[in-house]
Amino acid sequence: MESCITVIGERDVVLGFRLLGIQHTIIAEGKDLLKKFLEVFQNPQCNIIIVSENVKNMMDKRTLRSVEISSKPLVVFIPLPGVREEETIEEMAKRILGIDIGNV
């Protein structure tokens, strides 16, 4: 069974990742963004989902919590241009892996 990395988001974001060689990409905006994200999130072959941070605002609290604690697939939100990232790499590692890399 092949595992995959999938990128979901606005056209500019997705095209950038295609240039980096990621084959599984989905261009989606608006309501379609959440729909496509949930389809990929439920796919057992997908290991990593890189998605536009816009999708966070569309999720209900239960779905967002499920996504935040998921390690397979691991979901990485792409910050919106001009918006400061909320979660640092150290915080993400602690949340997902349960380890504190800030004091290493």
Curated annotation (Swiss-Prot):
Gene Ontology CC entries for this record: plasma membrane
Top-rank lineage group of the source organism: Archaea
Keyword Membrane in annotation: yes
Cell location: Cell membrane
Biological processes, Gene Ontology terms: proton motive force-driven plasma membrane ATP synthesis
Pfam families recorded: ATP-synt_F (PF01990)
Annotated protein name in UniProt: A-type ATP synthase subunit F
Organism lineage: Archaea, Methanobacteriati, Thermoplasmatota, Thermoplasmata, Thermoplasmatales
